Amino acid sequence: MALVVVGSVTRPTPPGFAATVLTPRARPESLAGPDTVTLDARADDRWTRFDLARRTIAAGGEPWDLAVKRHHLVVNGGTGLGGVGGVLRLDRPFADIVEAPPDGYGPSRVTPGGDTVNATFDGWYRYSYLSHLLTPRPVTFVLRTHDGRFAKFAILNYYCPGADPGCLTLVYTYQGDGTRRLGPTRSKPPSTDSRPDR
């Protein structure tokens, strides 16, 4: 005789955030941020294109840097796209990234089937087969924007209110002066060497 134990598994309710009401701003000429925004990417038939500098959703032919559709992300750079963007994944905390690396940025590409993809974003989340929820991994993406500037961002959440998937919350910093500096310069700790300088 076999004994079967049936347990109750409850699905956790992830935090949910409503899409940020975005008002365009002037393009920063220096380091701007960190700024936290939630983008509505629930539609599976169109991309939500985000302009990091202007902190707004790009319409029509307006320039954009990052596009999201459900859990898919791409940058505005690569064959068939109008920008020079690329992205690099770093397995380090957002606050620790103070300068963008000089190279290694992966562009997006259009597949033979017409989909736009960027392999650098593959695996940005963990998927639970028990709860069927996506949880962002603790990684930072460094972005070369559509016009060659630099930014960094980390994905914080993927859910809208009511556990509805597709509201991508991210924190980002944008550098408007053309340099690769993405955070405050960290000062060196004071020396404990008591010898006079030679």
Question: Where are the language model's segments positioned?
Answer:
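Surface-exposed, beta-sheet-biased, low-hydrophobicity segments with strongly acidic/polar composition
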Residues: 1-198
